[in-house]
């Protein structure tokens, strides 16, 4: 008899309140299949890596990840071990005996899940035979020249083979397999074609054709129902990939997407409405001290300021304490990531700040990897000059301090001319002379290979943001991922984000958007759009996102020019906030991190697993979903105090007066508001299982 206990699952929106018997994981095996298991390529790696702990806590030794084998990743990320589960051990042994190379171990991340990794190159001799199998299964042919698709065919064929071996030795256990993206979809197609007794889930994080069409500057969302899908895929030479993706979607027992906006897209592009929307989460780590993340912001901001001192040597005519650090990061997709609208908004922001004679300087970083051949010599020289000046200042300070100390011991007020001798003055004059330069600070930190056609640099030339002294907006393109070993900006991405004031991600195509979510978890305000999954999620579940530091640009129902004006308004309003207002806003932003915790969002994956088991094994698992209650779902409430946002409590000048701060002291109590927010979010959610009590059922599972 299956054991179970009740689990209270409450909707963040869309999913009704429902109480079910917990799945008997002792009698189940869960496999998640993705090309990015131990293999960092894009955002799916983050999804799987961060979700692993929550899933491993729930499923224990019966949870396995399947991915490709790469020697470097295996050495650095995986600890090899022998499979404990008998069915998995037999499957691995059987495949190795038949000429495959299957590696098994624990992934060295939180949760330490088991991983099964297939060596693609070792099994490439089967490629032609497996192409025939795929053609017989779904009449999809793969061109010889498409190396990536051929690799996916090998990976999918090995996955289906492995799952067959597992089910042959499962000894009555039921198998659930979740496949992420089209790269893993061939394994699903072949498993279903061979009628393997497994419950399948297919999750799309973005549609193939959607990404291609949006990159071509097409008005995608207003023409979703007008595209000739086959024609568009054929013109872009991805028809076979599109067919694999669509076949995977229609073969799966349950189809899921990561956001509502992607669900709409998938319904039109792939011709199936998703059964469940599974938002992406993060592992949220709370600090023991309430304001520790504020201290980290100050510490890492100082390190960014050091870089700016070197990069802008000879042109440091602005106050670093009145400088705001903004950034955009991600793949180099100029239009999809919104770099085009961001640059245009920066041009307009520069005009506004100059027109109002603001003393605020905005420093904008573009962290987008592109093709480079080396560091920019001027940038390297700037950091060398900065370090030289620091050494000179430190040397003079030591001598100055010793002479001052001796004079005070003698009871004398020293003459500065006596303390600073001629050698010191000469050294300082040489140091000052070394900071002089005729050229402007470089816009990019590296030498770009195609700088004449680079979209970001071409736009910068058009709008004229060349880091002139008169510009209030300065731009720095860092065409490389951040690293703590870099000689220019030795910081990891997380450290850099914590040191910035605002992340700007005005994406046109963003199925979820981990970058603004990561900002939120770290207490950094961000700009997103209503075309990103994250933006739609926050718009749905937070009554006043702007008050909590989530600025949502309307890119769906406004023209590009209107969207650009709205973004400019957000940026200008942010520049007008006082330091205190920004601190209050960061506190509120960090409190939203509970909404993005996998402990909450993991329930959507639980629901998908229940659903697929009920469809694959209706005699064993059954679910009767009744109509959800008539409710609009939970909304994180607006702060009780006046929100320190451009729309609600911005100062009329770049800096607020002391009197204004005193007034804010009276109406804002950080601890009281934080406690109210904690109660608000915990009342509709439950982090732990609810062992007792029966509620009105909105879904019931029977054995």
From Swiss-Prot:
UniProt xrefs under CDD domains: GT3_GSY2-like (cd03793)
Pathway linked to the protein: Glycan biosynthesis; glycogen biosynthesis
Residue positions binding alpha-D-glucose 6-phosphate: 291-292, 294, 297, 301, 501, 582, 586
SUPFAM superfamilies the record matches: UDP-Glycosyltransferase/glycogen phosphorylase (SSF53756)
Pfam families: Glycogen_syn
GO molecular function terms listed in the Swiss-Prot or TrEMBL record: alpha-1,4-glucan glucosyltransferase (UDP-glucose donor) activity; glycogen synthase activity, transferring glucose-1-phosphate
Modified residues (Phosphoserine): 8, 11, 627, 641, 645, 649, 653, 657, 683
Disordered as annotated region, ranges: 628-703
Known outcome of mutating residue 479 to Q: In GSD0; loss of glycogen (starch) synthase activity
Binding residues annotated for UDP, in chain numbering: 40, 331, 515
Keyword Glycosyltransferase set for record: yes
Gene Ontology annotations for the cellular component aspect, listed alphabetically: cell cortex; cortical actin cytoskeleton; cytoplasm; cytoskeleton; cytosol
Residues annotated to bind UDP-alpha-D-glucose: 205, 211, 331, 510, 512-513
Biased composition (Acidic residues): 658-674
pH dependence: Optimum pH is 7.5-8.5 (at 25 degrees Celsius) (non-phosphorylated state). Optimum pH is 8.5 (at 25 degrees Celsius) (most phosphorylated state).
Disease affiliated with this protein: Glycogen storage disease 0: A metabolic disorder characterized by fasting hypoglycemia presenting in infancy or early childhood, high blood ketones and low alanine and lactate concentrations. Although feeding relieves symptoms, it often results in postprandial hyperglycemia and hyperlactatemia.
Function: Glycogen synthase participates in the glycogen biosynthetic process along with glycogenin and glycogen branching enzyme. Extends the primer composed of a few glucose units formed by glycogenin by adding new glucose units to it. In this context, glycogen synthase transfers the glycosyl residue from UDP-Glc to the non-reducing end of alpha-1,4-glucan.
Protein name: Glycogen [starch] synthase, liver
The organism of origin for this protein: Homo sapiens (Human)
Lineage: Eukaryota, Metazoa, Chordata, Craniata, Vertebrata
């Amino acid at each position: 008899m299956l054991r179970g206990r009740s689990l209270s699952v409450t909707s963040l929106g869309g999913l009704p309140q429902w109480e079910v018997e917990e799945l008997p994981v002792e009698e189940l095996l869960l496999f998640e299949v993705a090309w990015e298991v131990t293999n960092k390529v894009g955002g799916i790696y983050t999804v799987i890596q961060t979700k692993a702990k929550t899933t491993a806590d729930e499923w224990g030794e019966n949870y396995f990840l399947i991915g490709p084998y790469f020697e470097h990743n295996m050495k650095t990320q995986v600890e090899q071990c022998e499979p404990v589960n008998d069915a998995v051990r037999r499957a691995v042994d059987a495949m190795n005996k038949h000429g495959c190379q299957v590696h098994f171990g624990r992934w060295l991340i939180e949760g330490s899940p088991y991983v099964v990794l297939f060596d693609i190159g070792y099994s490439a001799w089967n490629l032609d035979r497996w192409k025939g199998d795929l053609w017989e299964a779904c009449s999809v042919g793969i061109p010889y020249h498409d190396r990536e698709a051929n690799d996916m065919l090998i990976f999918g064929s090995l996955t289906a083979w492995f799952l067959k071996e597992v089910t042959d030795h499962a000894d009555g256990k039921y198998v659930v397999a979740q496949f992420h993206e089209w790269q893993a979809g061939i394994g699903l197609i072949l498993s279903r074609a061979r009628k393997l007794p497994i419950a399948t889930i297919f999750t799309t994080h973005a549609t193939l054709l959607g990404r291609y069409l949006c990159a071509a500057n097409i008005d995608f969302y207003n023409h979703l129902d007008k595209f000739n899908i086959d024609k568009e895929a054929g013109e872009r030479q991805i028809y076979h990939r599109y067919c694999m993706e669509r076949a995977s979607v229609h073969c799966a027992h349950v189809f899921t997407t990561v956001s509502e906006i992607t669900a709409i897209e998938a319904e039109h592009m792939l011709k199936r409405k998703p059964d469940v929307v599974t938002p992406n989460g993060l592992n949220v780590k709370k600090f023991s001290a309430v304001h520790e993340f504020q201290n980290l912001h100050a510490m890492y901001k100082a390190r960014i300021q050091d870089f700016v001192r070197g990069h802008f040597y000879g042109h440091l005519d602005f106050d670093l304490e009145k400088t705001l650090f903004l950034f955009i990061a991600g793949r180099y997709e100029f239009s999809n990531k919104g770099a085009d609208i961001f640059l245009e908004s920066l041009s307009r922001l520069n005009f506004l700040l100059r027109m109002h004679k603001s003393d605020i300087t905005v420093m904008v970083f573009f962290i987008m990897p592109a093709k480079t051949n080396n560091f920019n010599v001027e940038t390297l020289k700037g950091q060398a000059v900065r370090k030289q000046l620091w050494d000179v200042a430190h040397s003079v300070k030591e001598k100055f301090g010793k002479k001052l100390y001796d004079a005070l011991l003698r009871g004398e007020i020293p003459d500065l001319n006596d303390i600073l001798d001629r050698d010191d003055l000469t050294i300082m004059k040489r140091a000052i002379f070394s900071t002089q330069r005729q050229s402007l600070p470089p816009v990019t930190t590296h030498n770009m290979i195609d700088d004449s056609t680079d979209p970001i640099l071409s736009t910068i030339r058009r709008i004229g943001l060349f880091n002139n002294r008169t510009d209030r907006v300065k731009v720095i393109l860092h065409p490389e991922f951040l690293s703590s070993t870099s000689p220019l900006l030795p910081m990891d991405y997380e450290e850099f984000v914590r040191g910035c004031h605002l992340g700007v991600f005005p994406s046109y195509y963003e199925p979820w958007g981990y970058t603004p979510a990561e900002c939120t978890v770290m207490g950094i305000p961000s700009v997103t759009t209503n075309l990103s999954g994250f933006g739609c999620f926050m718009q749905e579940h937070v009554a006043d996102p702007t008050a909590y530091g989530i600025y949502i640009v309307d890119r769906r129902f406004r023209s590009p020019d209107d969207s650009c004006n709205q973004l400019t308004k957000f940026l200008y309003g942010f520049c007008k906030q006082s330091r205190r207002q920004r601190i209050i806003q960061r506190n509120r932003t960090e409190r939203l991190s509970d909404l993005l915790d996998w402990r909450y969002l993991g329930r959507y994956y639980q629901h998908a697993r229940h659903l697929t088991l009920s469809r694959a094994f209706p005699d064993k698992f059954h679910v009767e979903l009744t109509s959800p209650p008539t409710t609009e779902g939970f909304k994180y409430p607006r702060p009780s105090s006046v929100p320190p946002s451009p729309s609600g409590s911005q100062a009329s000048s770049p800096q607020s007066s002391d009197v204004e701060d005193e007034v804010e002291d009276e109406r804002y109590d950080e601890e009281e508001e934080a406690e109210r927010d904690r109660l608000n979010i915990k009342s509709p959610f439950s982090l732990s299982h609810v062992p007792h009590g029966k509620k009105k059922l909105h879904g019931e599972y029977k054995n």
